[in-house]
Amino acid sequence: SIWGNQSSILVGDYLLSRCFEMMVEDGNLEILKLLSSTSSKIAQGEVLQLEHKGEADLLEENYIKIIELKTAALFSAATRVGSCISNLDNKKKDALESYGKNLGLAFQIADDALDYFSKEKIFGKEIGKDFFEGKVTLPIIILFQKANSIERAFLTNSFKKKEREKKDFED
């Protein structure tokens, strides 16, 4: 895109802050608490992902924790907010929140797989972006688990580089 990720982040920050303003104006403390908690979780997930950047031997549990804190938390909050606005009982709120979390996990796992196995025209964005950014996702975790020692060394070296090359991605 012309403006890159930075404008998307700024727009997202603006929308989040606007949501907080609206919740304060509305006086809905349940939603305000949920949104503030969710933004904290997303930030924790970003930090955790940065801590593990370039680790080809990332454990699956750590990957799941990262996507729980990021994508799943966002989907979970969206469904919970909808249930709060609809004045549903707590059992239904909890069920929708759980649904949102699981939908977020499924979405992120599928998105991560498509980053390696889709075509750019179909996927709608650059293929291999996670690889080039040094983000280890489930396809790499599974590949690393099934790899022999030579393949593991290749993956480890590829992810330790400051910049990964197209040749590394294609190999």
Annotate the PLM regions:
Residues 1-171:
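All-alpha prenyltransferase/terpene-synthase fold signal
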